[in-house]
């Protein structure tokens, strides 16, 4: 203590004789980041924080984009637990993965998306790399476009689109444009507006498409509408960039959910594709995803793969191991794959059932509004058509939390609270 005290005295004497030293130290301590402003809170995380502070026993969080069981609890798929047990029993090492990820995972992901009998797979004219979930796949794809897509910097997003699409592409150096997608009057797909806008997009531009379970609206084109969109894309020579975060989770059928992607490829449109296993395997925190580029031939695919690895290396060197092992085990083990497909269908069916129950309960409440769009929409999210002031009332009067645009996560609705939700919605809309 004596030494510490004497040290302080000496430093104080030094500062007295050399006041510039104290001023310099003070400047160094406070001047580097004074210009940095407080960033805005994430709108969805903000909903969750407000929900946590609420003490109402009937409170509902319909903002979170994660599946919940019918008790409102996080759900780990039994097939995932089995895969984890099998992996643990093998006593595997924890060595780095290659830059492109776990080979057996990448192969299985491409097969899941494109179909096991895909001509693209048989000819080898594709490359798939493992990514840090769907967000990582989008960023890798966006960075590849920024570096090698020499025709345009414009990426056309549906209006609306997932909130993270804009910063991902913007931060990669691309420019964002939009095309009509959602019709607020019908709470459905604005097919006429979408086709009209896409047909006017400058040739050799990038068009982002949600493969299934459009986020945030839950509104998807029908197969015949997808066909017409593909025709326009081919005619305008647009590059189709697919985001497929919900394969299997939308309809309960993985092949049905991948129909649009496969149709585009069958029409001779070489696409790129982002996949995520957060929703359909419940591997949210494992960050498991894939990015696939369909190429002209196998030689082009090899060159694209080499450049994707060059992009990945300075970003994160190589992807995480554990989640990819789990996904690969499920996709490549017949009994686990069969079980997983049944579980995915079970999750999708529960969400479809909650949509039906919500509409039924709204009718029981005496609501005269047309709520058919709730059952017409698909996937985890539903655009209710509620106005911001109605959303505010739901929060203040009923402790029901959602984003201001009226989007709800149907996964947060259970057989135990759907009646309360219907009552609250009726009260703010009657």
Swiss-Prot record:
Q: Where in the cell is it found?
A: Mitochondrion matrix; Cell membrane
Q: Which cofactor does it need?
A: pyridoxal 5'-phosphate
Q: Which residues carry this modification: Phosphotyrosine?
A: 96
Where in this protein does the record say Phosphothreonine is found? 48, 333
Keywords, sorted A to Z: Acetylation, Aminotransferase, Cell membrane, Lipid transport, Membrane, Methylation, Mitochondrion, Nitration, Phosphoprotein, Pyridoxal phosphate, Transferase, Transit peptide, Transport
Q: How does it assemble?
A: Homodimer.
PANTHER family from the entry?
Answer: ASPARTATE AMINOTRANSFERASE (PTHR11879), ASPARTATE AMINOTRANSFERASE, MITOCHONDRIAL (PTHR11879:SF22)
Under which name does UniProt file this protein? Aspartate aminotransferase, mitochondrial
Identify the species of origin: Macaca fascicularis
């Amino acid at each position: 203590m004596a030494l510490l005290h004497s040290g302080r005295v000496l430093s104080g004497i030094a500062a007295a004789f050399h006041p510039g030293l104290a001023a310099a130290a003070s400047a160094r301590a406070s001047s580097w980041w004074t210009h940095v402003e407080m960033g805005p809170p994430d709108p969805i995380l903000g909903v969750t924080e407000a929900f946590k502070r609420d003490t109402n026993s009937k409170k509902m969080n319909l903002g979170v984009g994660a599946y919940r069981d019918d008790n409102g609890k996080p759900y780990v798929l039994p097939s995932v637990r089995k895969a984890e047990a099998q992996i643990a029993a093998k006593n595997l090492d924890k060595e780095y993965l290659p830059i492109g990820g776990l080979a057996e995972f990448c192969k299985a992901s491409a097969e899941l998306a494109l179909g096991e009998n895909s001509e693209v797979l048989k000819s080898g004219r594709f490359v798939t790399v493992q990514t840090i979930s769907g967000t990582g796949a989008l960023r890798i794809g966006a960075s590849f476009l920024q570096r090698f897509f020499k025709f345009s910097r414009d990426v056309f997003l549906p209006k609306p689109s997932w909130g993270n699409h804009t910063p991902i592409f913007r931060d990669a150096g691309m420019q964002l444009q939009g095309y009509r997608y959602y019709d607020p009057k019908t709470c459905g797909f604005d097919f006429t507006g979408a086709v009209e806008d896409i047909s006017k997009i400058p040739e050799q531009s990038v068009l982002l498409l949600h493969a299934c379970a459009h986020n945030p609206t839950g509104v998807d084109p029908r197969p015949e509408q997808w066909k017409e969109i593909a025709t326009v894309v081919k005619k305008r020579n647009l590059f189709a960039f697919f985001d497929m975060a919900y394969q299997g989770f939308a309809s309960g059928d993985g092949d049905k959910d991948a129909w649009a992607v496969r149709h585009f490829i069958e029409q001779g449109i070489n696409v790129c594709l982002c996949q995520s296993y957060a929703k359909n395997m419940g591997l949210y925190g494992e960050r498991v995803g894939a990015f696939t580029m369909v190429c002209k031939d196998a030689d082009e695919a090899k060159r694209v793969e080499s450049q994707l690895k060059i992009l990945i290396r300075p970003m994160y060197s190589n992807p995480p191991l554990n989640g990819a092992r789990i996904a690969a085990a499920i996709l490549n083990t017949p009994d686990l794959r069969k079980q997983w497909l049944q579980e995915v269908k079970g999750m999708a069916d529960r969400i479809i059932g909650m949509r039906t129950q919500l509409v039924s309960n709204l009718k029981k409440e005496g609501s005269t509004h047309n709520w058919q769009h709730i059952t017409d929409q698909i996937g985890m999210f539903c655009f209710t058509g509620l106005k911001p002031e109605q959303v505010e009332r739901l929060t203040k009067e009923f402790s029901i939390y959602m984003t201001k645009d009226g989007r709800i996560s149907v996964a947060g609705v259970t057989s135990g609270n759907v009646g309360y939700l219907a009552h609250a919605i009726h009260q703010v809309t009657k």
